């Protein structure tokens, strides 16, 4: 620490006396303009230092510098508990969560790429007629003048405008008006005549006029290359367009050229492209039917044809089963030979045209669309309303086919592609398209800046490992890691300098293959002049860091100290740092001595969801199985979109979530009684939720206190010892222990409740003691302390012991769930399953990256918990990139080989020892180093 005395706020951010959450009055110096990694066990205080102290103060000071008027629109920030922070800059936090639930937000809009695309298409897009495939153009005054000036000098041109008669006027009236306007001649019947001569001809003057039957002679001009000619031509062309309602003819040497001021071709008038024309968030550009959402509540094809492995004859179409509705099917079956429809072929093997025919029908049979329209017409009958509700769901809008834009927006092309083609491409394809876009001349000048911005942002998204996404992908369907990396790419695109970026495990959801690219992105963020602070457990990230800070030594009340601060090489030699011991190999997660054999399994046949290529995958039961693969390879589609909902349906616990596309599910499904998706979401939705209530130990503790003599004498029931119901809890703070005071333009202040002194309960409840402790004192105990305190209470002990087993001995019983990290929340859920023990149903537990936020030591404890669950007869299935987790698995399923369209295949299924010999597997290549031992 002696070195830190020399540090100045010019070179270092100096934090003095940080006391947020479990931080123990620590002093930390963070070097500026460096890549700094903060590491330590889950719950040690990393996030408290990075987010609740450093980011909170950087953001608060920036907001305080704004006017009170501006501040009312900003989130109000708490001042962190710290003596002082010197040398701090404005801070930007890029957290691990999906930032929006807006159904209109997409990857394109959130990264601003779509804004640039709208401008690009509005400025250089060519409108192509869907009838002839020719470009739609519109003439202007200047383009007509330029055409005339390019003719041979001395040529005489005649400008003619078609006479468009007003409703009800005869030829005589129109010609009289032309005379009043100063026109002298017209072309009528292929000859030029004076208007006065025609007016006197009674044979034709009273007849009805057709549009363009008479042409007004606007001017005759001799082409000379001088200003007078240019000015005269300009005036005459403008007059001609006005009189001809946007149309004009130019005659020279017997040739007649047509010019139009209108944007039309093939008898269709097209809209001129503007940025709003391509905006699905604007009524002008949005599809009229779905209003820019891309989906409508309509007939869901997946519900109409639930089993795609069946043929039409075999009952693939669910509403056409049964006697009455089966009549619709019979018409199709009987007439199928007439138009060569394969009624015995599985639905999934039909061509796109054949599938479309089932919906549209033809002259021989009525399709599904007509069938449902007839049901709609009879909704006054309850049986039809019930039937319709069975097949309703969110479906792609039939008008825009899910692209959200009005149909004519797709007529505008750049490089032969419409804007909807671009947003449906994987990002790497879109980047390649724009890099090789052939533009010349004026187009290049207009598009240069726009293309630079588009290419930059696409490049950043590919660099952070998101090349498999599309710009049309909804933001609320992204994982936390994907969402964070999109924010990171957006920050890079904005080129901010002189700020502090605080990131929460950006490597989550990223295969080790892509981690190196992410590191180079973070370094480029540092190199432009920013301080990048990353909370991270990934070894590669630590190796790349300029500076490491290890918070610990353990978690919760046993953490909150700065164990180490220095370089990667220095931490390898540090004996106090647990992180250093794992990095240097002194401590490690051992490879299991033997893998569990298995005989039962569940198989998914023909998985087609998203990018999956119709694969068959076997999932072993009563084992620890890991699904691996690079980002975007199809792991989540396989496990969360197909296996999870399909199993729920099979065992009768269907949640209503739409199942992904697959052919069949087979195997020992009867061996599974329950399916649990264990995520890292908070364990409760309110600040009242805490570990002791979640594992149901508080019920036993309340019963114990209600059984004490003073409680019996006062007639107190167990409910009196609850802070969630009225009776024994403090009436002022309603059992919260604290009150919130709202401050205008400043952060709300949270103070201990004056009535109960932060104890949550009324005095008569606090007077009841067990072993000299009140219920309020018990809530302040850590799990470790509570296990000693309740050693003679087996019921309470049985519910607290699993919390200690999963490594949460340091957590206080009454700690609010809102202060728990994602890893801690997940392990509390695990403990609740361990508590059920042998009494629980045989369960398949599905985890999506359970190592998020976990230190090497935490992963060791998590693996022990997995072993305990499997010993109880359960099965564990994990989607994971962490090599320590993969090497500990009994069975590995590798999906890939790449992300997006190049993925979705089953690369490998077998033992980890065999995976390292699979040449096509990136996971196998990285696993080699971890299986040497």
Predicted regions and their residues:
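Conserved phosphate-binding elements of NTP-dependent enzyme cores
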Residues: 1-933
């Amino acid at each position: 620490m002696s070195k830190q005395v020399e540090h100045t706020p010019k070179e270092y951010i100096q934090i003095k006396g940080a006391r947020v959450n479990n931080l123990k009055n620590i002093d930390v110096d963070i070097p500026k303009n460096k890549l700094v990694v903060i590491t330590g066990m889950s719950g040690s205080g990393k996030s408290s230092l990075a987010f609740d102290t450093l980011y909170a103060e950087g953001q608060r000071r920036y907001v305080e510098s704004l006017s009170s008027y501006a501040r009312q629109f900003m989130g109000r920030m708490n001042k962190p508990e710290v003596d002082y922070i010197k040398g701090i800059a404005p801070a930007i936090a890029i957290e691990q969560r999906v930032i929006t639930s807006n159904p209109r937000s997409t990857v394109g809009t959130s990264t601003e790429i779509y804004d640039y695309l709208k401008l690009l298409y509005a400025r250089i897009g060519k409108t192509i007629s869907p009838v002839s495939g020719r470009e739609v153009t519109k003439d202007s005054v200047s383009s007509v003048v330029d055409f005339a000036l390019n003719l041979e000098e001395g040529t005489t041109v005649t400008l003619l405008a078609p006479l468009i008669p007003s409703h009800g006027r005869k030829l005589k009236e129109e010609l009289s008006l032309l005379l009043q306007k100063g026109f002298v001649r017209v072309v009528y019947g292929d000859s030029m005549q004076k208007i006065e001569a025609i007016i006197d001809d009674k044979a034709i003057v009273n007849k009805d006029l057709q549009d363009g039957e008479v042409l007004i002679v606007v001017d005759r001009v001799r082409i000379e290359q001088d200003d007078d000619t240019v000015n005269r031509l300009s005036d005459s062309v403008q007059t001609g367009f006005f009189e001809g309602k946007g149309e004009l003819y130019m005659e020279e040497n017997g040739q007649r050229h047509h010019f139009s001021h209108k944007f039309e071709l093939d008898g269709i008038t097209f809209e001129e492209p503007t940025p709003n024309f391509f905006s699905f968030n604007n009524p002008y550009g949005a599809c009229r039917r779905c209003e820019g959402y891309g989906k409508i509540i309509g007939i869901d094809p997946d519900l109409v044809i639930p089993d795609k492995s069946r043929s039409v004859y075999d009952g693939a179409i669910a509403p056409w089963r049964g006697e009455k509705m089966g009549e619709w099917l019979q018409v199709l079956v009987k007439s199928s030979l007439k138009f060569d429809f394969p009624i015995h072929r599985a639905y999934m093997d039909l061509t796109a045209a054949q599938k479309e025919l089932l919906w549209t029908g033809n002259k021989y049979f009525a399709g599904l669309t007509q069938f449902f329209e007839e049901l709609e017409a009879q909704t006054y009958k309850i049986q039809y309303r019930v039937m319709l509700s069975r097949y309703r769901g969110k479906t792609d809008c039939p008008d825009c086919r899910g692209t959200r834009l009005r149909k004519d927006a797709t007529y505008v092309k750049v490089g032969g592609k419409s804007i909807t083609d671009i947003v449906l491409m994987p990002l790497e394809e879109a980047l390649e398209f724009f890099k090789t876009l052939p533009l010349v001349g004026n187009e290049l000048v207009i598009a240069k800046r726009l293309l630079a911005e588009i290419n930059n942002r696409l490049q950043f998204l590919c660099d952070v490992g998101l090349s498999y996404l599309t710009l049309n992908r909804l933001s609320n369907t992204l994982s936390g890691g994907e969402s964070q990396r999109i924010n990171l790419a957006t920050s890079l695109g904005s080129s901010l300098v002189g700020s502090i970026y605080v990131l929460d495990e950006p490597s989550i959801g990223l295969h080790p293959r892509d981690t190196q690219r992410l590191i180079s992105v973070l370094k480029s963020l540092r190199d432009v002049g920013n301080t990048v602070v990353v909370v991270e457990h990934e070894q590669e990230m630590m190796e790349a860091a300029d500076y490491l800070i290890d918070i610990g030594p353990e978690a919760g009340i046993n953490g909150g100290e700065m164990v180490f601060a220095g370089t990667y090489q220095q931490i390898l030699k540090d004996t106090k740092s647990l992180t250093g011991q794992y990095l240097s190999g002194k401590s490690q997660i051992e490879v299991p001595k033997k893998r569990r054999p298995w005989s039962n399994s569940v198989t998914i046949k023909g998985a087609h969801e998203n990018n999956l290529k119709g694969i068959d995958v076997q999932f072993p039961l009563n084992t620890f199985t890991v699904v691996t693969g690079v980002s975007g390879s199809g792991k989540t589609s396989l496990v969360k979109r197909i296996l999870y909902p399909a199993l729920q349906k099979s065992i009768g616990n269907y949640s209503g979530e739409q199942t992904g596309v697959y052919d069949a599910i087979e195997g020992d499904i009867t061996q599974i009684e329950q399916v649990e998706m264990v995520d890292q979401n908070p364990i409760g939705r309110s600040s009242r939720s805490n570990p002791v209530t979640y594992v149901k130990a508080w019920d036993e503790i309340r019963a114990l206190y209600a059984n004490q003599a003073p409680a019996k004498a006062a007639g107190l029931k167990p409910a009196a010892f609850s802070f969630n119901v009225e009776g024994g809890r403090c009436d002022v703070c309603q059992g919260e222990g604290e009150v919130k005071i709202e401050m205008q333009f400043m952060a709300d202040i949270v103070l201990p409740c004056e009535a109960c002194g932060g104890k949550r309960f009324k005095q008569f409840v606090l007077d009841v003691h067990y072993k000299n402790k009140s219920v309020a004192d018990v809530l302040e105990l850590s799990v470790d302390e509570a296990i000693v305190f309740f050693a003679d209470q087996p019921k309470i002990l049985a519910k607290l012991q699993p919390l200690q087993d999963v490594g949460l001995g340091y957590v206080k019983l009454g700690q609010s769930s809102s202060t728990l990290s994602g890893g801690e929340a997940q392990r509390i859920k695990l403990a609740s399953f361990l508590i059920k023990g042998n009494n629980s149903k045989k369960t398949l537990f599905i985890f999506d990256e359970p190592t998020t936020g976990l230190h090497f030591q935490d992963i060791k404890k998590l693996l022990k918990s997995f072993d305990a669950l499997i010993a109880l007869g359960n099965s564990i299935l994990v989607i994971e990139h962490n090599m320590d987790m993969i090497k500990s698995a009994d069975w590995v399923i590798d999906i890939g080989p790449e992300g997006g369209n190049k993925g979705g295949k089953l690369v490998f299924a077998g033992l980890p020892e065999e995976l390292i010999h699979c040449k096509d597997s990136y996971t196998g290549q990285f696993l080699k180093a971890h299986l040497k031992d």
